[in-house]
Amino acid sequence: IRQNKVQLEALFYGMCGWLEEPVDSTMELWNREFRFLQSKFTLLDVRFSPKFSRLRPANFPTIRLSQLANLYVEQQNLFSIMIQNPDYQNIRTLLSALSASDYWTDHFSFGKMAQISFVKKLSPEFINLLFINCILPLQYFFQQLNSESKVGHIIDSYRNIPPEKNHIIKHWENLGIEFQNSLQTQAFLYQYKTFCKAKKCLNCAVGFQILKNAEQHKT
């Protein structure tokens, strides 16, 4: 199945419960393949429900799962490439070349033709997010598990990735903070989630100083 993209897509979409009412010939093909796999591997009748809300069409789970299927087919030694013996430029190159199947060139959702047709590839910004939130953390965990001392190399990799953009980072920027790389933004995201969101101002050097200054202004 790792060498059959149609079956991989059928497996992903079928386990999401999206193939039960096919509306075109491609969906019918995926549905047949999923029923075959379901019988062959005695798959449990469990359905996962990826979310579409608040996502841009290019980020829809339909597109991302197709790209994931393509990645599995094209890279049979994925763990070694991404985690065990990573070559960062090579990873970027293969991710940049990755695309969804032809069906999604003129679709975002099943059975609905899009107004604009284009090959669905990964954007540079999305590839950066994969490094920040997936590839580098897994590399760190793997090296810690195997007592390897390459943590500094991973930290340097974060320094070489541009800062990500999200609403939390935007709030920090509105306060005058300037970010040069993703190592800095990750530190401030940790700060927000660990202290600010949990209202642990007194346990935070920054929060404590702000409260201290506020108290001095009152007096």
Model-inferred region functions:
Residues 174-219:
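Acidic, carboxylate-rich catalytic segments that either coordinate divalent cations
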Residues 1-185:
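Hydrophobic, aromatic-lined core segments that form the binding pocket/scaffold
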